[in-house]
């Protein structure tokens, strides 16, 4: 299995659960030239009518300033890897089984395929687990 694996810094923030709220944040980022490769939303676990948005990458002073202007910040409680490569049947199983055999637990997983390529975003509770997963998937 040939995977390309890299760490990514995820940014996050709250979004009111109403039409256009996420689009307003994304508009500011688009005008700043931010080319997002990962965007994920979910309900806030403790606040009704609020959602959470997670996105990456954001880098450089201008992009960071734009993200902060819409109340986004680096996610400090999650470490994430992006795994990419040639897609085939069972790719999710291959990734998950290699991590399971090594005893690495995931916090979250998102896998998508377009054409013959896949991208998997693996979330971990801490940087040590992400480092262990990186080693498992690249050796």
What are these regions (language model features)?
Residues 1-139:
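A conserved regulatory-domain signal marking ACT and ACT-like small-molecule sensing domains
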């Amino acid at each position: 299995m040939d995977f390309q694996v890299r760490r990514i810094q995820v940014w996050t923030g709250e979004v009111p659960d109403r039409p256009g709220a996420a689009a307003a944040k994304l508009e500011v980022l688009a005008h700043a030239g931010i080319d997002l490769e990962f965007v994920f939303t979910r309900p806030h676990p403790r606040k009704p009518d609020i959602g959470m948005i997670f996105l990456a990458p954001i880098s450089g002073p201008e992009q960071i300033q734009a993200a902060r202007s819409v109340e986004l910040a680096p996610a400090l409680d999650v470490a994430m890897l992006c795994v990419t490569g040639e897609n085939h049947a069972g790719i999710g199983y291959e990734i998950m089984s290699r991590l399971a055999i090594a005893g690495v637990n995931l916090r979250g997983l998102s896998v998508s395929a377009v054409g013959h390529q896949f991208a998997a975003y693996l979330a971990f509770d801490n940087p040590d687990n992400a480092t262990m997963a990186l080693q498992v998937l690249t050796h």
